[in-house]
Amino acid sequence: MNSTTNSIDEWNAVAEQAMDLLKQLIATKSYSGQEHESALIIEKNLQSHGFEVERIQNNVLARGKHWVDGAPVLLLNSHHDTVRATSNWDTDPFEPVEMDGKLLGLGSNDAGAPLVCLLYIFYWLNERDQSFNLLFLASAEEEISGINGVPITLEAMGAVDLAVVGEPTSMELAVTERGLIVLDVTTLGESGHAARGEGVNALYKAVDAVQWLRSYEFQKVSERLGKVGMNVTQIEAGTQHNVVPDSCRFVVDVRPNDCYTNAEIVNIIREHIDGQVEPRSLHLNSSGIANHHPVVLKAKELGVSRVSSKTMSDQAQMPFPSVKIGPGDTHRSHTPNEFIYIYEILGGLMGYAQLLNGLEIPYWSPR
């Protein structure tokens, strides 16, 4: 790894090391909020390569060895928490299994492979002269957009000018990403006896609201993210069959585009719904990076596809410019028998190296 450009044999050796780490992580349960053991594995790996590590709860942060005050800062980030395993796996989700050119295991694709590739590219970039400083962050609680993930690391990281977020994008560069608003909606009525048709049925009010949510289209359509998306995903009403319900509660999953703030979207919904509309949070915003940013231009030069992402990542909690890219396929995420193709590890390493080595990063954060 000491030459400017690695031979394929050298890259294969790096890929084997990354694979070994990925297998350790798969074998370690790391549900969101329970990432202590996986954080320890990543911490020890960094220390074995000579890096000082800062643990911020279950987040693992490391700085490059050749830090230059005042230089722009590149953050390499991916998450090491996973969703919970479902019961319909054909193999043990915590046992890394190689078969048919694949590595199976929970978190192998989302986001174990991007994580280990970014970590070993962090090592690789540290051995080469760059015009930027390097940060590496293995974050916790990404799958639940938790407050004990990226948000509690921002102060420790300081100024960041560009983040590369590792998620399974088939090594396409996601230049925009939808945000998320989860709404708890309650419609109110008056209880009464169902046989006598008494009361005001809150469930019927909810049906009217759901019909509006299903048919309404926000006027502003993003060139890159398209329309705002809304889906009702949960509903609950009533206590027994012969009582008209006096309240109905339902949940709405809203995926904003970059034409509206989250608060603007909530206000529009409130204007049209006869009920209480309460967002669980407003901070998971859409994100995007300018088409003329050097990382976007370099991706174009390399023939890397630039896409918009419908799924959300830790980008939503980052106040600085970011892109999302990594080995693996988003359609494999959160599925039984999750896997990564072994060749994707090698492709991820080489793809990251081509994109990031020698990149000129403009300042964004104030110094």
Map each language-model feature to its residues.
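A structural signal for short hydrophobic beta-strand segments in well-ordered beta-sheet cores
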Residues: 53, 96-98, 232-235
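Metal-dependent amide/peptide-bond hydrolase catalytic core
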Residues: 2, 13, 84, 175, ...
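Predominant activation on well-ordered alpha-helical scaffold segments within soluble catalytic domains
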Residues: 23, 43, 116-123, 151-154, ...
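Acidic/histidine-rich catalytic neighborhood of metal-dependent amide-processing enzymes
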Residues: 115-182, 186, 222
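N-terminal helical capping/dimerization or prosegment-like subdomains
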Residues: 2-85, 247-251, 265-271, 342-353
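Active-site metal-coordination/substrate-binding segment of hydrolases
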Residues: 71-135, 342
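Hydrophobic/aromatic beta-strand patches that form the interior of the parallel beta-sheet core
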Residues: 74-76, 137, 164, 323-325
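Short glycine/proline-enriched coil/turn segments at helix->beta-strand junctions
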Residues: 47-51, 57-58, 70-71, 127-131, ...
